[in-house]
Design a protein with these regions (language model features):
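Active-site-proximal loop/turn and secondary-structure-junction residues that shape catalytic pockets
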Residues: 36
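ABC-type ATPase nucleotide-binding domain
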Residues: 43
Length: 121
C-alpha cells in the first residue's frame, strides 16, 4: 500500500519511505510492478483504500519517471526461484524488485524478514 499512501499523503508512510519516493522521483526511475497495480485494483474495489485503480493510474501518468513493470516470463521465472513462503502477489512484487535490481518500499514484515530484497521503510 506504500504507493497509495504516498499518493494520498497517508500518515502511515514512514519518513524513510517518503524520502525514498521523493529521492527516486527526483533522481531515478520508480518501478511499479504490475502486481502492485493488480493489488490496488483488487483492494480499491473492496473499499479498503481511498484511491481508485483509475486514480492511481492517472497519478502514475503524471510522473515522467514512473515505469510500470509488466508481469512477464522474466518476473515469473524470478518468482519461481524464491523459496520463501509468501502470498503470490508479494512474491511477484519481490521478484520484480529482484529482476530490476530495485529497492522495495514496503512495511510488509514477511518481506522484510525474508531478506531477499533490499527494503526501505
Amino acid at each position: 500500500h506504500s504507493l497509495v499512501w504516498y499518493f494520498t499523503e497517508d500518515a502511515r508512510l514512514s519518513k524513510k519511505a517518503i524520502k525514498a519516493f521523493e529521492g527516486t522521483i527526483k533522481e531515478g526511475t520508480l518501478v511499479v510492478p504490475a502486481a502492485v497495480l493488480a493489488e490496488i485494483m483488487y483492494i480499491s474495489k473492496r473499499g479498503k483504500i481511498a484511491l481508485t485503480f483509475e486514480e492511481t493510474l492517472k497519478t502514475i501518468e503524471e510522473y515522467e519517471n514512473f515505469d510500470i513493470a509488466p508481469l512477464d516470463i522474466n518476473i515469473l521465472k524470478t518468482a519461481d526461484r524464491i523459496e520463501t513462503e509468501m502470498e503470490m502477489h508479494d512474491k511477484l512484487i519481490v521478484a520484480t524488485a529482484l529482476y530490476y535490481k530495485a529497492r522495495l518500499i514496503t512495511r510488509d514484515e514477511q518481506i522484510k524478514k525474508a531478506g531477499i530484497v533490499s527494503v526501505v521503510w
